[in-house]
Amino acid sequence: MSKTFEYVICGGGTVGCVLASRLSLAGHSVLLIEAGPEDYNDRIMSPVAAPHLHGTEWEHNLMTTKQPGLGNRSVPNYAGKLLSGSSGINYGLWTRGHSVDYDSWAKAVGDERWNYANMLKYFQKTETQISTTAAARIYPLREPIRNAMVAAGLDYNPDPNGGNPLGFGPFTENWKNALRQPASKAYDLSKATVLTNSVIARVDFDDPKTTATGVTLTDGTQYTATSEVLVTCGALKTPQLLMLSGIGPQQHLAQHNIPIIADLPVGENYHDKISATFFWKLRHPEKGYALGSPRFNKPEFRHGNPIEWVATVPTPHAELIKATQQDQIDSDDPYLQKPRGNVEVMVAYAPIAGGGSEFRLPMDGTHISSPVVLLLPTSRGRITLASADPTADPVLDPGYLDTETDRAAIRAGMRVALRLMETESAKEVIDGETPPPGHEPLTSACSDADLDRRVQIVGSSFFQNGGTAAMGTVVDTQCRVKGVRNLRVCDASVLSVPLAGHYQAPMYALGEAVADMLLAQ
């Protein structure tokens, strides 16, 4: 095997696979290096297996520091550790997000290539509409839940991926023929050299320490990049690799005796989305309304997540203004200019709890759930090194719910979830909320303090990490690391602000956009 390539890609995740495919098919020599294995076993490929992949060898199983916003709990945070990355272990959600988010991103960094109109072609390039839901995969509670959303005052949105997700609409997934579509299968890697089960120790630089020249693995093997090194390890692991390579905050690197190459705020600006879930007891579980019931047994129900509707809602304006004033957010901030998709509310026909939640129920067909996801967190944390050992886990401090703006948003979403189940349509099938032991059921009229206490028990990561090598401070608008040459970061680390959606679709689009930049050189 050659040790020299035009491009060396560090991380065989979603974006890494896109870049390796596009560059190699265009005739460039490409080495794609992944820390985990290449695996397509049934546990990975099944659409309903994702909850059971947490804690396995196919994930980086990380823990946050104790989070004051979550009752001083440490909660799990996961990232894919296999060829395909998180596209190989995620829940298959396919959401582009809100056009306003992309337009704000472009304005903030001063480059219109990142606005929604320009990113749309990259979404479309990676998408193929293969089907709508098969008639046999219509769940028993489809109409009662739809009617509840209407009764709760939510507007129907037939295309939440059309640039404005506000309202409620169909839940969109990217399974094909009842199988996962990992990036390494969806994109042709036949012309790329793929190296799995290989951990990168550092990015190498030339003698003046200004130009990236390749990488060194933990076993000492070195590979040379004659054009560029592309870092695509994901928002949790990319900052670790950069800092181990001398790219990061000078004072922090000095603590670990790492020679500085570029003093940049790597690991800062860390944002992640949290979720809080309600469980609802069914009036007639014997009718087969939920996963775990013997009558919830159509084969088509295993073709995707047991979810049909998703709502995206803004924080009520008066509450938003009050909270942002408390946080001293400038009135000109784009966050305040238009209604944004602050929170997502789903109804799952199973008691789906977030990773790290202290309250769980068995999947025995007696309960459904409402996951509430904070889509646009304003809280910021940081990722740091625990040591200079590349096999050690980084230290994650996301700062969950540090701002009143975030607390107001998650409360607003929780009230929507409660209001849904207080409608007459929902009450026909729902007996009520099952709260954590020792707690009373909540209502939409409960106090803010009641909601805050609940989040401290059930709040957990939704595994949508970003911002740790942010565009504008760490990389430029072409994802090139500042202060050095021939080094780019191409993953959710570059998202200086969150997007109101799940990051799978945006990361595919990001990969396509960066591939176009490289091929245009």
From Swiss-Prot:
Q: Which SUPFAM superfamilies match?
A: FAD-linked reductases, C-terminal domain, FAD/NAD(P)-binding domain
Q: Which domain of life is it from?
A: Eukaryota
- The protein's annotated pathway: Secondary metabolite biosynthesis
What GO terms in the biological process aspect are recorded for it?
A: secondary metabolite biosynthetic process
Note the coiled coil stretches, chain numbering: none
Necessary cofactors = FAD
UniProtKB keywords:
FAD, Flavoprotein, Oxidoreductase
Q: What is this protein called?
A: GMC-type oxidoreductase acuG
Q: Which organism is it from?
A: Aspergillus aculeatus (strain ATCC 16872 / CBS 172.66 / WB 5094)
Q: Which gene encodes it?
A: acuG
